[in-house]
């Protein structure tokens, strides 16, 4: 599934961008609403639920709070470094546990 995108602001605060509609790729076509916002010096993080649901040996999920805490430490990093850092965080969390869901994410930043 697609969780709400996270808009991380330079001051460390964040906003969840809640949207409606079906999961991408399920239907051949559908009507959707468009919106605009100024990214400014913020960071936009889009991800699938497999990121926050990724579990370790103790069956503890990675969780939204941990994801936001990680993103707060990355506000001055390039998107490629954020992605590689998050992959490392996820690997350290799940260790050798098999994952049953995709972990897909996208970082947008000026």
What kind of region is each of these model predictions?
Residues 1-110:
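Conserved subregion of the PPM/PP2C metallophosphatase catalytic domain
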């Amino acid at each position: 599934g697609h969780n709400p995108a996270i808009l991380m602001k330079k001051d460390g605060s964040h906003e969840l961008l809640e949207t409606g509609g079906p999961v991408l790729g399920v239907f051949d076509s559908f009507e959707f609403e468009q919106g605009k916002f100024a990214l400014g010096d913020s960071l936009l993080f889009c991800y699938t639920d497999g990121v926050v649901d990724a579990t370790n040996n103790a069956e503890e999920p990675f969780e939204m709070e941990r994801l936001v805490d990680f993103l707060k430490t990355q506000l001055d990093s390039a998107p490629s470094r954020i992605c590689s850092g998050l992959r490392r965080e996820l690997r350290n969390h799940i260790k050798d546990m098999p994952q049953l869901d995709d972990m897909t994410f996208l970082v947008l930043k000026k």
